[in-house]
Amino acid sequence: MVTFTSEASRSRSKKVCVIGAGPAGLVSARELRKEGHKVVVLEQNEDVGGQWFYQPNVEEEDPLGRSSGSINGELKVHSSIYSSLRLTSPREIMGYSDFPFLAKKGRDMRRFPGHKELWLYLKDFSEAFGLREMIRFNVRVEFVGEKEEEDDVKKWIVRSREKFSGKVMEEIFDAVVVATGHYSHPRLPSIKGMDSWKRKQIHSHVYRVPDPFRNEVVVVVGNSMSGQDISMELVEVAKEVHLSAKTLDISSGLSKVISKHPNLLIHPQIESLEDDGKVIFVDGSWVVADTILYCTGYSYKFPFLESKGRIEVDDDRVGPLFEHTFPPCLSPSLSFVGIPRKLIGFPFFEAQAKWIAQVLSGKSSLPSPDQMLQSVDEFYRSRDLAGVPKHNTHDIADFTYCDKYADYVGFPHLEDWRKLLCLSALNNSQENLETYRDSWDDHELLQEALQSSHFTNFNS
């Protein structure tokens, strides 16, 4: 186990609550403790991993993942991982800066391993750095709100409930870091007839295995990676799989899959759902379906957070957040890790965690609230001018932004090999959707990665 000797003075040490023990929460806990802060991590599951802690039993969850009838708007099941899920990026690019995601004998050694292997990596990480001692498992956060200020010092009330005993605990913290992820609460489309359609409708949040759909006619809504993966799995058992996409301008990789499987058909978006089971598409074609499976993504939700309107989720735009991390009017005592999407997650979470920890200890400072708000407004305008829908505000897909962010804390830029391996996997998936995880042509890049200090320093 690695231990840390902090140089931060005790007067700078803060009592910090981290909500969530997934990839973002774990690295946040580590970086906060490095800076001398006293850290408590609250995790609703019985182990680390967040999304990567697989939950096979979804019988008690609403099929569409609606949380309206649950306590405090929470879901019963956090993870949306399905049984066969494999990583869409090679393991070499996914590790934290000082803890590479190595293949280990006796485990899943593939470059694109299954979800269990990433969960085991996170367990290894938490054990290597002694993080478990900071985590309270089976504890769900029900309320986070400001405490009345004393001497102009902002503090936070955190109320949580133990899963089995039902015991409620209320604590005061100097700061709260929200690291709850954003792949749990389904984002559902609005389709005419959806509420009255009598046949089976589920969201991919509760999809686990293909067997329940054997010999069915299934309509899969959404052409994302999960929509494609699940469709390719369903064609082996379902009578027909009809994939409904926003555009019929599909990748050559998906086109190859469709030509290979005569029971997999592509359609445009859905116009309406009819009482007799018909699913009518916008081009006038239709099919009578047994099941509609929505692979339509997820929404940001923080049902426990009472911010008095200073942090809001508007069509999946969480804001205002300076650099997707600090709410200007509540910083630095409230922060978020893991909001951005479509980037190499673990190194970015690590950079966020370092920045938050340093700001709380006084090693780094933030602009004024007005300056941060101005920066957020400028970012929103740039997204609007680029034609980016509001619900894609946090889809970054930009290595330059990641490098700029790292400069806030002197965190190393993403290595060239990491960027190129990411792009190589993405391009390969576009061309060879069924085989890209097991067949690739980036061997020279792979060797460059394995000979880099990211791997050699760790192995030495």
UniProtKB/Swiss-Prot annotation:
Residues given in the record as NADP(+) binding sites: 222-227
EC number of this enzyme: 1.8.-.-
InterPro entries: FAD/NAD-bd_sf, Flavin_mOase, Flavin_mOase-like, FMO-like
Protein residues bound to FAD: 20-25
Record key words, sorted: FAD, Flavoprotein, Monooxygenase, NADP, Oxidoreductase
Cofactor requirements of the protein: FAD
Molecular functions per Gene Ontology: flavin adenine dinucleotide binding; N,N-dimethylaniline monooxygenase activity; NADP binding
Gene3D superfamilies to which the protein is assigned, alphabetical: FAD/NAD(P)-binding domain
Sequence similarity: Belongs to the FMO family.
Function per UniProt: Catalyzes the conversion of methylthioalkyl glucosinolates of any chain length into methylsulfinylalkyl glucosinolates.
UniProt-recorded name of the protein: Flavin-containing monooxygenase FMO GS-OX-like 9
Species name: Arabidopsis thaliana (Mouse-ear cress)
